């Protein structure tokens, strides 16, 4: 049996209470499919992620992806208002903070893109098996997260573009407190090896994200 405390927001000062009596708890009020709502989750995720542990999970709420209902819950169905780039950002942030992944849409109505978001094994491994997850860098328009891969040597690195314009982002490993000179980079959303580097970089669309595995050489 799983006890999920909902809705939120759960006060972070009561984390020991939640860990003792529940397996998951909502970190926010109902999360819906809008960029302002998604952007607000970054600060909550950063605060809660270091406090998660097996059997006690901060919950960023269900995934409003694919064909979903409206807040009035009168049976109407529509496609999510999040752009495809924002949907990638949502899945990347939820996975990097190790939130429970609970689909909030009409599963039989999924299109190929929505299904690809939910079934990417390399991304799901981040949510299910990473550790040490935390926000490692923030500027006015960009955020980076870092986590340990299961073997404790490799790192997962996520880059997020919070701005309304496309931008090229680059962060040195030293800025992310990754103590290696170089690593072999792999883009987990694109299933593409990128070669060796001493930094993480990507051209990110507005509100977009990228997720990498850095394998220590």
Where are these regions (language model features)?
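Glycan-recognition surfaces
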Residues: 2-102
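Flexible loop/turn segments at secondary-structure boundaries
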Residues: 10-13, 72, 103-104, 110-114, ...
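Hydrophobic, well-ordered secondary-structure elements that form the walls
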Residues: 157, 185, 207
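Catalytic cores of secreted or luminal carbohydrate-active enzymes
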Residues: 89-137
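Loop/turn elements at helix/coil->beta-strand transitions in domains of secreted/extracellular proteins
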Residues: 1-2, 153
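C-terminal beta-strand-rich structural cap/linker in extracellular carbohydrate-active enzymes
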Residues: 195-217
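Carbohydrate-binding surface patches
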Residues: 94-97, 102-104, 138-178
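Solvent-exposed beta-hairpin/edge-strand motifs
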Residues: 174-190
């Amino acid at each position: 049996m799983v006890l999920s405390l909902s809705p939120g927001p759960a006060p972070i000062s009561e984390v020991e209470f939640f860990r003792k009596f529940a397996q998951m708890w909502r970190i926010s009020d109902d999360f819906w499919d809008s960029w302002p709502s998604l952007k607000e989750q970054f600060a909550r995720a950063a605060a809660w992620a270091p406090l998660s542990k097996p059997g006690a999970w901060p919950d960023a709420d269900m995934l409003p992806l694919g064909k979903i209902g409206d807040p009035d819950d009168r049976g109407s169905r529509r496609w999510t208002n999040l752009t495809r780039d924002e949907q990638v950002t949502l899945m990347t942030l939820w996975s990097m903070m190790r939130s429970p992944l609970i689909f909030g849409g009409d599963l039989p109505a999924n299109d190929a893109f929505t299904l690809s978001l939910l079934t990417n094994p390399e991304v799901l491994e981040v949510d299910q098996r990473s550790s040490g997850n935390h926000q490692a860098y923030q500027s006015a328009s960009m955020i980076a997260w870092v986590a340990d891969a299961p073997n404790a040597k490799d790192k997962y690195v996520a880059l997020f573009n919070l701005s309304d314009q496309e931008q090229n982002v680059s962060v040195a490993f030293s800025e992310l407190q990754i103590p290696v000179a170089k690593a072999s980079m792999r883009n987990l959303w694109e299933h593409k090896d990128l070669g060796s580097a001493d930094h993480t970089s990507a051209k990110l669309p507005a509100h977009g994200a990228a997720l990498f595995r850095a394998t220590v050489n």
